[in-house]
Curated annotation (Swiss-Prot):
InterPro entries: 4pyrrol_synth_GluRdtase, 4pyrrol_synth_GluRdtase_N, GluRdtase_CS, GluRdtase_dimer_dom_sf, GluRdtase_N_sf, NAD(P)-bd_dom_sf, Shikm_DH/Glu-tRNA_Rdtase. NADP(+) binds at G177, A178, G179, A180, V181, G182. It comes from Pyrobaculum islandicum (strain DSM 4184 / JCM 9189 / GEO3). Homodimer. Its EC number is 1.2.1.70. Pathway: Porphyrin-containing compound metabolism; protoporphyrin-IX biosynthesis; 5-aminolevulinate from L-glutamyl-tRNA(Glu): step 1/2. It catalyses: (S)-4-amino-5-oxopentanoate + tRNA(Glu) + NADP(+) = L-glutamyl-tRNA(Glu) + NADPH + H(+). This is Glutamyl-tRNA reductase. The active site is at C48 (nucleophile). Catalyzes the NADPH-dependent reduction of glutamyl-tRNA(Glu) to glutamate 1-semialdehyde (GSA). It is an enzyme of class 1 (oxidoreductase).
Length: 393
């Protein structure tokens, strides 16, 4: 039984469309998540460079329904399945599919989305195991190779870009947004010794957390505070997610000289009387660092393939755990019923103990079979046991 075959991925990246289109599709996918609820397990990754949806056990019709969400804005999307879908996710986590090869921001964004969607009940079961493993792959690649040495992501590249325009040590800087990208920006700006640092976020507590780590000042992300930052600061970085412009005008007499827009879709209006830096402006710098990191790509790809080879065994073990937990629960209920019939707590305890003694060694044996490569046999036996005891998974 191939436990990767039920995995599907709908993929669209910065290579195919502009960041504004990605932002609009990302918002549509947020609504799609809510509509799907807790039906088919799903995981959506939306960053400044991609919108990807991973489904497990979805019917062809469900996959096409999700793909149609993309097709509202683009003519075609890439749909991949099975081991190729897992390979793609692992490569994304490793930073191998990014504009800046080896970037670390994407791993933080992947983890943020994963934690949020697991809590909401969207990402679960074997899909949860696959995404968890992708996170591990991303961390392992960055630990065992030098692919992430230097700029950590597009935020880092934007700081390099701006530092070529003015002296950052003499600059007052504001960061709008305290998520993975915004927090990374703040940490790096603090390390560069900017004159003054402000962190704005819709949730003020989150801004305070980042400010405490960077020596910055936390402010709420409101229209008034954004305007205040434009008046006081030399540079403003926007890393927030918004379907409306966060900055649509520059107040008269403002000090701001450069505005950096890392939002998807764009959060800074065009035609402003200051220098506006967008994601597309960072490609040339990214290519320079990609050339430096090229020698590490093969090492990272080897780790991805090594982890892919392990994945089927991990999924089999997890599948067996989920399956047997259900039939053990059924057996325990039967034991309690027999104990209740006997009218004795001791009899109930004895029955439960007997169930454990009989079934737990079987469970461990099935797990060992999966680890030894007898995946199909172990899965079939687990299914047979489940069906025999009366609960089919």
């Amino acid at each position: 039984m191939d436990l990767l075959s039920p995995l599907s991925a709908i993929v669209l990246t910065y290579r195919e469309v502009d960041t504004d289109t990605l932002g609009k599709i990302g918002e549509e996918m947020r609504k799609c998540l809510e509509q799907m609820g807790r039906g088919t397990p799903i995981y959506v990754l939306h960053t400044c460079g991609r919108v990807e949806a991973y489904l497990y056990g979805a019917s062809p019709e469900e996959v096409q329904t999700v793909a149609e969400t993309y097709r509202k804005y683009v003519n075609s999307v890439r749909i991949i399945a099975g081991v190729e879908a897992a390979r793609h996710l692992f490569r994304v986590a490793a930073g191998l599919d990014s504009m800046l090869i080896g970037e670390t921001d994407v791993l933080g964004q992947l983890e943020e989305a994963f934690d949020r969607q697991v809590r909401a009940g969207y990402t679960r079961g074997l899909l949860k195991t696959i995404v968890e493993r992708a996170v591990r792959v991303g961390k392992r690649v960055r630990t065992e190779t030098a692919i992430s040495r230097g700029p950590r992501g597009l935020g880092s590249l934007s700081i390099i870009y701006v530092s070529r325009l003015l002296d950052m040590r003499q600059a007052k800087v504001a960061v709008l947004g305290a998520g993975a990208v915004g927090a990374g920006l703040a940490m790096e700006l603090a390390a560069r010794g900017v004159k003054k640092l402000y962190i704005l976020n819709r949730t003020l507590e989150k801004a305070k957390e980042v400010a405490a780590k960077t020596g910055g000042e936390a402010r709420p992300l409101t229209k008034e505070e954004v305007e205040r930052c434009l008046r006081e600061c030399d540079v403003v970085f926007s890393s927030v997610h918004s379907m409306e412009y966060i900055i649509d005008k520059i107040p008269e007499g403002a000090s701001v000289k450069v505005v950096v827009d890392l939002g998807v879709p764009q959060t800074v209006a065009s035609g402003l009387p200051v220098k506006v830096v967008r994601i597309e402006d960072l490609r040339e710098i990214a290519e320079q660092y990609n050339a430096e990191r090229a020698s590490e790509i093969a090492k990272a790809e080897a780790i991805v393939e090594e982890e892919l080879a392990i994945l089927p065994k991990l999924l089999a073990r997890r599948y067996i755990e989920e399956t047997v937990s259900t039939f053990i629960e059924t057996a325990m209920l039967a034991a309690e019923e027999e104990g209740a019939r006997a009218g004795c707590n001791t009899a109930t305890l004895a029955a439960r103990t007997t169930v454990k003694r009989i079934l737990l060694p079987l469970v461990e044996r099935l797990k060992k079979m999966a680890e030894d490569g007898q995946i199909e046999e172990a899965v079939k036996l687990a299914q047979m046991l489940s069906q025999t005891i009366g609960r089919k998974i």
